[in-house]
């Protein structure tokens, strides 16, 4: 009933109201700023709330009707109540400082990686889930781990040459351009991760949501 009332109000006046977006870190940081700017120009009277959470948290919030739209980096998912659209790949890579000895190696093996200090995302996160699947598939046990809640902190630690990290390539593009970090493909990593827009199946696709989705699609196409 609450959802129906909100839909009715949006239909009456799509130039007023509010929209709540949940986004995981990578799309929130590297995709949404320009999209939100375009949205505010088109709908200046719409209040936007952006919540940065992990992908599992965003899925739960959508199921509970706590947010209108989710934008997440995730592996392909199959949840009947949630409708998803794949908008772009979000490739995980193995990142390290240009001073790290991996930057001088022609080939990095699984055994080489196993001996390094690994910077890990906290649970729950899609990155951590995929990394766990990869380590189990190849019987890898890290000898030294540092668990972090912040991707920015992880990147700063990497710059000092202190360890390696499995990280989104999108998240380190600026550091790569500035020659602060290097990366290689993760050896024998066969898992797929993309950025998806995701919404509850009973959430009406209003003019506001439609414009937002078009802005996201336009951004990913030109980039």
Regions from the language model: what does each represent?
Residues 16-78, 148:
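Central regulatory/effector-binding core of bacterial HTH transcription factors
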Residues 102-103, 117-138, 205-213, 223:
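Secondary-structure junction motif
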Residues 42, 53-116, 190:
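Acidic, Gly/Pro-rich loop/turn segments at junctions of secondary structure
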Residues 31, 182-223:
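A late-sequence structural motif
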Residues 54-67, 73, 126-183:
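Hydrophobic hinge/microswitch elements
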Residues 35-44, 111, 128-141:
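Ligand-binding cleft/hinge of the Venus flytrap
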Residues 1-20, 29, 37-45, 79-85, ...:
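Short helix-loop hinge/linker segments at domain boundaries
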Residues 22, 92, 108-127, 220:
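Short loop->beta-strand "edge-of-pocket" segments that line small-molecule binding or catalytic clefts
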